[in-house]
């Protein structure tokens, strides 16, 4: 494959095993729903996207089931520019474990040499399997909104952008990844400026992603 983009960014998919993130990953990669077999290690694909008249290359990484065994190794998180944090809107455990995944993201980034967890890459929250009708056991919109508010109140991220998707019906796949791609580029450019300006104490970097989208 011929790479035309000068900037190569990394986007990672995180969330519980069987949360639906691999189905979303495969749908965005153009693979047919339900027939793809995961490899034994991390799965990835490359895509070049035009962002504001700039061609940017993106390496998308999925865990491919590795999260079943233990926490992911720090290599998976190294040089990530944005995270896609997924949960199954019908699965209580996958929703409760969202905090665990954010904690792991921050800890692995610190292990990889990031100076502060406040400099961790931004994330977009995706609720999967929206094609399945909600029941009393499903995660309510009110609980999701409260989780987003708690994250914002803790200043983990300025604003949580949330989307509900269905890989089976190809519903709401492109829009979140358009936002994710822009967040990744913003983060990459900010970190590049920070690295070039270590001696400038007035430089501030944050996860303030003021891009219009569905949000909590």
Curated annotation (Swiss-Prot):
Keyword Cell membrane among record annotations: yes
Gene3D superfamilies: P-loop containing nucleotide triphosphate hydrolases
Cellular component aspect of the GO annotation: late endosome; lysosome; phagocytic vesicle; plasma membrane
Name of the molecule in the record: Ras-related protein RabN1
Native species: Dictyostelium discoideum
Record has Cell membrane as a keyword: yes
GO molecular function: GTP binding; GTPase activity
Top-level taxon in the UniProt lineage: Eukaryota
Short sequence motif named Effector region, residue ranges: 37-44
UniProt record similarity statement: Belongs to the small GTPase superfamily. Rab family.
Lipid-bearing positions (S-geranylgeranyl cysteine): 216
UniProt xrefs under PANTHER family: RAB FAMILY (PTHR47981), RAS-RELATED PROTEIN RAB-7A (PTHR47981:SF20)
UniProt-listed PROSITE patterns: RAB
Swiss-Prot/TrEMBL keywords: Cell membrane, GTP-binding, Lipoprotein, Membrane, Nucleotide-binding, Prenylation
Transmembrane domains' residue ranges: none
Positions with a binding annotation for GTP: 15-22, 62-66, 128-131
Topological relation to the membrane, as annotated: Lipid-anchor
């Amino acid at each position: 494959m011929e790479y035309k983009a000068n900037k190569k960014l990394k986007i990672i998919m995180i969330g519980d095993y069987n949360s639906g993130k691999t189905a979303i990953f495969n749908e965005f990669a153009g693979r047919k729903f339900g027939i793809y077999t995961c490899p034994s290690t991390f799965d990835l694909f490359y895509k070049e996207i035009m962002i504001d008249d700039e061609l940017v290359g993106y390496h998308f990484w999925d865990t491919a089931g590795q999260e079943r065994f233990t926490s992911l190794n720090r290599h998976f998180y190294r040089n990530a520019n944005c995270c896609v944090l997924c949960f199954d809107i019908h699965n209580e455990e996958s929703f409760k474990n969202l905090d665990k995944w954010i904690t792991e993201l921050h800890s692995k980034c610190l292990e990889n040499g990031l100076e502060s967890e406040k400099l961790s890459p931004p994330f977009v929250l995706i609720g999967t399997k929206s094609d399945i009708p909600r029941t009393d056991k499903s995660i309510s919109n009110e609980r999701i909104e409260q989780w987003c508010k708690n994250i914002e109140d803790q200043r983990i991220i300025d604003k949580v952008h949330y989307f509900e998707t269905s890989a089976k019906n190809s519903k709401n796949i492109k829009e979140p990844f358009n936002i994710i791609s822009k967040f990744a580029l913003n983060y990459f450019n900010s970190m590049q400026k920070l690295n070039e300006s270590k001696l400038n104490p007035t430089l501030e970097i944050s996860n303030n992603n003021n891009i219009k989208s569905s949000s909590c």
